[in-house]
A protein has these predicted regions:
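Short glycine-centered helix-capping/turn motifs at secondary-structure transition points
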Residues: 66, 118, 156-157
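N-terminal glycine/serine-rich phosphate-binding loop of ATP-dependent small-molecule kinases
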Residues: 1-97, 109, 125
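Short alpha-helix plus adjacent loop in nuclease-associated cores
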Residues: 100-117
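Generic secondary-structure signature for well-ordered alpha-helical cores
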Residues: 60, 64, 116, 145-152
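Generic structural marker for isolated residues within well-ordered, non-membrane alpha-helices
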Residues: 59, 111, 120, 140
Length: 157
């Protein structure tokens, strides 16, 4: 049965894994919700360790429910949470901070500063995208500015 295809859907409120047979029919699914963290109004975070652990669990359970083994997996597709942003230590694999979720608006002041003096149009011209709290760039700036030791770690590579 080496023609199983897995799909991991790591979404805003849960992580699910579906197994499909050679004909593309779903044969198993397992899903687990994860905690939503709201440290301040407008801020939304997820625990990246919880997400990683639940991802591993849903994959194992979907394979088990499909009556398959890991060696039976022919392909894997992954979807993720849009612009949710995580930074981690490349040596330890540990996150420096909770994931900042795509709906989080803590970067509104960064966006306002970047958009002064008609820069909104400049950014759209260069990137094709508007300045918005949605995107990962402002989230990374916020993390570099606010997480103790992160900027120094980034500068060290």
């Amino acid at each position: 049965m080496s023609d199983i295809v897995l799909a991991i859907d790591q979404g805003t409120t849960s992580t699910r894994c579906m197994a499909f047979n050679h004909s593309g029919e779903p044969i198993a699914v397992h899903q687990l919700e994860h905690q939503q963290i709201f440290p301040k109004p407008g801020w939304v975070e997820h625990d990246p360790i919880e997400i990683w652990e639940k991802t591993q669990l849903v994959v194992r359970e979907a394979i088990k429910k499909a009556g398959a083994n890991p060696g039976d997996i022919a392909a894997l597709g992954i979807t993720n949470q849009r612009e949710t942003t995580i930074v981690w230590n490349p040596k330890t694999g540990q996150p420096y901070h909770n994931a900042i979720v795509w709906q989080d608006v803590r970067t509104d002041k960064i966006i306002a500063e970047l958009g002064k003096n008609d820069s909104q149009d400049r950014f759209r011209t260069i990137t094709g995208l508007p300045l918005a709290t949605y995107f990962s760039g402002p989230k990374i700036k916020w993390l570099l500015d606010n997480v103790d030791g992160l900027r120094e770690a980034a500068n060290r590579g």
